């Protein structure tokens, strides 16, 4: 069983997916973390982390590194680098690198392999999860929220290291890039359950989703 969660950046996908995983006893996967790890690989290869590298160069670098999955976490060469990928430098570049078709193919293949060789149930969140990676998922969700709300959430997550105005600009730019991607663009898929989380807490959102999920299972019996 796969529950797929889609939506724009900072709409609550990761927090909600993690909590749903705990409540439903499903394993959690974030495709966004995988793209961020690849962005970290690119930045580590450069003298100036604000520069960019070509798609071919990045594809070669990925082959030189080991990305594995263990206990709902992607590891880079056996190391948990989550504290190194959730920052403004990664935010600034991850949309650019995730627009490379070759990179998206690698990420999608990795996600499918994790699920294919496992008997576990999964909650997988990320942009294009419901449209490209797992369009056949048994339950598809699209989480949304206003830019102002998303910026405030990220501001709190980052302990105020960036201003709200900076975060709003970053998110607007990210939305624009994600919606115009040639491959894997951000959009609503057929049969998706749409939920605006702007003024809902984590507990309320999870309760709504679980109620909808249970109702769907009853109807399909």
Curated annotation (Swiss-Prot):
EC number: 2.7.4.25
Keyword hit for Protein biosynthesis: no
InterPro entries: Cytidylate_kin (IPR003136), Cytidylate_kinase_dom (IPR011994), P-loop_NTPase (IPR027417)
GO biological process, one term: pyrimidine nucleotide metabolic process
Kinase keyword on record: yes
Gene Ontology CC annotations of this record: cytoplasm
Top-level division of the source organism's lineage: Bacteria
Molecular-function annotations in GO: ATP binding; CMP kinase activity; dCMP kinase activity
Keywords tagged on the record: ATP-binding, Cytoplasm, Kinase, Nucleotide-binding, Transferase
One Pfam family per UniProt: Cytidylate_kin
Sequence positions that bind ATP: 7-15
Compartment annotation: Cytoplasm
SUPFAM superfamilies linked: P-loop containing nucleoside triphosphate hydrolases
NCBIfam families recorded: cmk
Protein name: Cytidylate kinase
Gene transcribed to yield this protein: cmk
